[in-house]
Amino acid sequence: MKNIVLIGSTGSIGRQTLEVIGSLPDRFKVVGLGSGKNWRLMAEQIRVFRPSAVAMAGEREIMNLKELLAGSYCPELGWGRTGMESLASMPEADLVVVAVTGFAGIYPTIAAIQAGKDVALANKETLVAAGHLVMKMAERHRAAILPVDSEHSAVWQCLCGRNSGEVEKIILTASGGPFREMCLEKLEKVTVDMALKHPNWNMGSKITIDSATLMNKGLEVIEAKWLFGLNYSQIEVVIHPQSIVHSAVEFLDGSVIAQMGLPDMRLPIQYALTYPERLPGSFPKLKLASLQGLTFEEPDTRRFPCLSLAFEAGLAGGTMPAVLNAANEVAVEFFLKGLLPFLGIPSVVRSVMEKHEMASDPGLEEIIEADRWARNMGVKVIRDLFN
């Protein structure tokens, strides 16, 4: 029995993680749950999984949760950054799943690593902003970082313990999003509802917008650099509209190993939870004979410049990836509120990056400060350019 702490339990990845855990009740026990503000769903999760500890974003959510749970089982409760960090470092936890979206995921991730816990990481921003610190910290505390993203899970499975010195390059696939074939003139008129309709994946709103701009793939490029110890010249992105090949690895001898499966996040989630074992899954399986065809093409960075911006930020290093991430989070937030056009997202990110005075070898506090600066600058840029 493996004891699981899940932070981000009410989000898309969190809910699917609990679905996987629920399908393997004799293998996993949920000992801790953390989430943002959805206290009603958290109450349901507590009733089903009966964790010993729970944390939420704020005290108000905890008070509402207490009231809803009155007269029934109530775990130990905490809130805010301190509550999440306590949850991530629970002594009884064997694996901490970090499924929080955004920069906030860095705090429980670091707390789990410092407590020597293995981390199943579904939060891109942690490695994007602080990959150089987090991977060194994980090595020092002997904590494993297990990728949950389908693309990184695919690369991990293709490598299968091989030395990165045998790798020529990795190939990250992207669906291309809902606007893969849309011209620039039409992209200028993209609405929020249009952008939230991903053709293949069922995801939260922020990552769905990132997929539409290709920023999601850009963040994954930076994440892959740290997860697998590669140079950016060894990371290639190709558009694969069917989302069946989740990524591939090309080795020095020219052979390519790819990982395939249906576009279902429960598959990489289950692999991260059960690793190093593979257990029977209760989810739909890929039938090769039913496939009509698999196609691949180069990404168009003229229409989708966020991918190029991510490579630029990664190559610059230092605080620049944190600035890229923070500016993007702000831009996506304003887009989702209808306060920024779709093509304004890369414009804001580029403008904030150009204004940033980069620190080349930042510590955690410098990264946090760069994140704060970029958010403030992002808001200023939006108000100056689009209002």
Curated annotation (Swiss-Prot):
Keywords: Isoprene biosynthesis, Manganese, Metal-binding, NADP, Oxidoreductase
Protein name: 1-deoxy-D-xylulose 5-phosphate reductoisomerase
Function per UniProt: Catalyzes the NADPH-dependent rearrangement and reduction of 1-deoxy-D-xylulose-5-phosphate (DXP) to 2-C-methyl-D-erythritol 4-phosphate (MEP).
Lineage of the organism: Bacteria, Bacillati, Bacillota, Clostridia, Eubacteriales
SUPFAM superfamilies to which the protein is assigned, alphabetical: 1-deoxy-D-xylulose-5-phosphate reductoisomerase, C-terminal domain, Glyceraldehyde-3-phosphate dehydrogenase-like, C-terminal domain, NAD(P)-binding Rossmann-fold domains
Molecular functions (GO terms): 1-deoxy-D-xylulose-5-phosphate reductoisomerase activity; manganese ion binding; NADPH binding
Domain of life, per lineage: Bacteria
Reaction catalysed by this enzyme: 2-C-methyl-D-erythritol 4-phosphate + NADP(+) = 1-deoxy-D-xylulose 5-phosphate + NADPH + H(+)
An annotated GO BP: isopentenyl diphosphate biosynthetic process, methylerythritol 4-phosphate pathway involved in terpenoid biosynthetic process
Annotated binding of Mn(2+), by residue: D149, E151, E220
Residues engaged in binding NADPH: T10, G11, S12, I13, G36, K37, N38, N123, E125, G204
A Pfam entry, by short name: DXP_reductoisom
Pathway the protein takes part in: Isoprenoid biosynthesis; isopentenyl diphosphate biosynthesis via DXP pathway; isopentenyl diphosphate from 1-deoxy-D-xylulose 5-phosphate: step 1/6
InterPro entries for this protein: DXP_reductoisomerase, DXP_reductoisomerase_C, DXP_reductoisomerase_N, DXPR_C, DXPR_C_sf, NAD(P)-bd_dom_sf
Family: Belongs to the DXR family.
Known EC number: 1.1.1.267
Cofactors (names): Mg(2+); Mn(2+)
Organism: Pelotomaculum thermopropionicum (strain DSM 13744 / JCM 10971 / SI)
Keyword Cytoplasm among UniProt keywords: no
UniProt xrefs under HAMAP family: DXP_reductoisom
Annotated 1-deoxy-D-xylulose 5-phosphate binding sites: K124, S150, E151, S175, H198, S211, N216, K217, E220
